[in-house]
């Protein structure tokens, strides 16, 4: 980002990054500090911290995507524990699984935005409903762990 600062005079106001519950490398290196895990390696130059310090809005694209472009994780057999926890929270809040997955991203203190890329009115309404849900920290971390991410 320092190179960009040197040569580009326009302020950077947003940065689009891939981010979902299973694809959460953006937060992994900050949480897996001093662990010998792939997530503990700084792959992005601390992009999350840089954007927060410089008031750059992070926009999460593919918010329902699994790693390696395997499709949507919602309802996938590859994430049974995650989907079960999402269903429990969806029932608790009276919303859809999509709403909970979107609320997980919106709950992060970086005040991220979602890039939905949907043409479905139903899905868009479910995503918008996430603005009215504030997951607890415990719920946020339960979903993070259920996706298979480690914590120290």
Predicted region positions:
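Beta/alpha (TIM)-barrel catalytic core signal, keyed to glycine-rich beta->alpha loops juxtaposed to Asp/Glu
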Residues: 4-152
């Amino acid at each position: 980002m320092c190179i960009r600062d040197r040569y580009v005079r326009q302020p950077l106001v947003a940065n689009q990054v891939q981010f979902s519950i299973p694809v959460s490398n953006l937060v992994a290196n900050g949480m897996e500090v001093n662990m010998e895990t792939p997530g503990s390696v700084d792959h992005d130059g601390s992009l999350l911290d840089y954007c927060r310090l410089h008031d750059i809005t992070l926009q999460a694209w593919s918010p329902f995507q699994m790693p390696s472009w395997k499709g949507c994780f919602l309802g996938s057999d590859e994430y049974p524990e995650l989907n079960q926890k999402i269903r429990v929270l969806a029932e608790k809040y009276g919303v859809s699984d999509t709403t909970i997955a979107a609320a997980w991203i919106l709950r992060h203190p970086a005040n991220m935005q979602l890039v939905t890329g949907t043409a479905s009115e139903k899905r868009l309404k479910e995503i918008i409903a996430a603005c009215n849900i504030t997951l607890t920290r415990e719920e946020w971390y339960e979903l993070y762990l259920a996706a298979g991410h480690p914590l120290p």
